[in-house]
């Protein structure tokens, strides 16, 4: 159901249908969390639904204001009316519609102020479920913001808002990840921070920047899937999520350890992995737009992400094993190792041959600008 919903969100040119499919997706996300066997998963699913009862109606109200102004819910018709001056882009109703839909987008994306609940649902889902949740979040985030871009790009405040909340997500995501001892929460906060990089590219607004943002989105889906599955494998082998109670795992699970290390380096933007290529493009895009301070911030966040992974990797894999930690005879399912291996190959290939993907993304972006 979730896959069908995000596919429909990508394909639709009707903003009301987009909202309907987003609601279906939200139900699927709640179901994935509630079906988990992890403690307090029901509580987290309920919290997500309660917040959804605030964010979703606001988005729908914003769509209603657009309908009142343009007498249409077709995105192309609305965008044409706005850019041809048939709708006053400075009218209070139009600006209010932007604010309401933007608030709904923040909820859908898990950007601040919804970053804690989004990272929470990741930590309460099964590993494969968390990977699905993150992919759903990334795709819905892109689908909604591209629709908003087509409608509101004439307003300078739109791009400012996207960049501001994206930067806020980057800073809060990595800052909160540094404080975590539960590695599932740590990955959840880092995943939210990486969403900020995606929003940053789209908010800068140039073809190259949006291409970089969409390439970052693809990398985000693949890299976080590898990390969620890898850390899920560690939970499967140790029944433990607290990094303070782990250690010495490198000797017992070297394959998982190596693949998690490479995945962490990819998320931090270390060459020649795929995360480096997309973040390099984002830094270049920021410089070309005249914002060197954003480029510096992106580099600093990437360095902080690297520090998070070095700290976590040492705690879990390199330091001596605690005496009360039982690891003998506990293996990781081969299916998890296989899935991680496939994702790792894709990460390496995209890092070495980024043009295979970026050229197609650039053509797509050129078609919507």
Label for each model-derived stretch:
Residues 112, 224-230, 293-328:
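Predominantly late transmembrane helices and immediately cytosolic-facing juxtamembrane segments
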Residues 149-152, 264-282, 344-365:
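Alpha-helical transmembrane segments and their membrane-interface junctions
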Residues 95-161, 188-189, 255:
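Short helix-boundary/re-entrant hairpin motifs in multi-pass inner-membrane proteins
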Residues 32, 82, 122, 149, ...:
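Interfacial segments of multi-pass membrane proteins
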Residues 253-255, 310-369:
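Cytoplasmic/organellar membrane-interface segments at the starts of transmembrane helices
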Residues 44-47, 124-135, 241-257, 291-301, ...:
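Membrane-interface alpha-helices at helix entry/exit sites of multi-pass transporters
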Residues 4-11, 31-32, 65, 102, ...:
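Alpha-helical transmembrane segments of multipass membrane proteins
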Residues 5-93, 107, 176-242:
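Alpha-helical multi-pass transmembrane bundles of energy-transducing inner-membrane proteins
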